[in-house]
């Protein structure tokens, strides 16, 4: 999930349960919910969850769904292994689709001298050793790529992956 509205994770997990995903799990107040289900079920859920939240909590949100294999592939393809030393310095942006016209030149212009980035398919990696919170690039990735995204630091991504593997 992405967006500025705050929703207690227990409420979000409960919503997954009401929609038939009793084994849903969350990781802190990250917007990440891990659940077990088929691809068709998950695709249906991607529409139903935002609709339910609009009705029950009065705000719009979006969901970006990832299969376990997609998370594993994103982690194994990490072009910045040095980010593993400080997992908060590496943000992984999971994109809603492949960018059709990413503005890589403007990304290059806005990045700081210490930042590095890479776009690999539907995943954008930002290594920001001076902190993602200070990054001008981090705040403009979606706009410059032209596609919706959700970003998680390496620590959160690894935690969500562990929860997903534990559900198997």
Question: PLM features: residue spans?
Answer:
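Surface-exposed, charge/polar-rich loops and edge strands
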Residues: 1-168
